[in-house]
Amino acid sequence: MARIAGVDIPRDKRVVISLTYIYGIGKPTAQILKEAGVSEDTRVRDLTEEELGRIREIVGRLKVEGDLRREVSLNIKRLMEIGCYRGLRHRRGLPVRGQNTKNNARTRKGPRRTVANKKK
């Protein structure tokens, strides 16, 4: 397996697909192969050291893996500290982007907590 940005990428897949195993690189960003002068159809095992070096250099300029994860978590912490609506939603563990919470949002809210009925 080739290592790029501290991640082992699969050898048997095409390079454009293998790059998406790196956090922060999706299919659009994987188009950096054109800049590196590498064909998208090439398998990782067929890459030369020179081509791998060019890809590593370009990926090194991007914010990926640990740096990107750290930036995202700091952004969320900042929202929570300033007390804006999105920060409050993060703090309470509710959906942040305006989704309905009356019936759904179980992934974000966690398992149901049943409430005892009042006696009449």
From Swiss-Prot:
Part of the 30S ribosomal subunit. Has been shown to cross-link to S19 forming a loose heterodimer. Forms two bridges to the 50S subunit in the 70S ribosome. Pfam families: Ribosomal_S13. Located at the top of the head of the 30S subunit, it contacts several helices of the 16S rRNA. In the 70S ribosome it contacts the 23S rRNA (bridge B1a) and protein L5 of the 50S subunit (bridge B1b), connecting the 2 subunits; these bridges are implicated in subunit movement. Contacts the tRNA in the A and P-sites. The keyword Ribosomal protein applies. PROSITE patterns: RIBOSOMAL_S13_1, RIBOSOMAL_S13_2. InterPro entries: Rbsml_uS13_C, Ribosomal_uS13, Ribosomal_uS13-like_H2TH, Ribosomal_uS13_bac-type, Ribosomal_uS13_CS. Belongs to the universal ribosomal protein uS13 family. Gene3D superfamilies: 1.10.8.50, 30s ribosomal protein s13, domain 2. The lineage of its organism: Bacteria, Bacillati, Bacillota, Bacilli, Bacillales. Keywords: Ribonucleoprotein, Ribosomal protein, RNA-binding, rRNA-binding, tRNA-binding. One of its GO terms (molecular function) is rRNA binding. GO terms for cellular component: cytosol; small ribosomal subunit. The keyword RNA-binding applies. Residues 93-120 are annotated as: Disordered. GO terms for biological process: translation. Residues 105-120 have a biased composition (Basic residues). This is Small ribosomal subunit protein uS13.
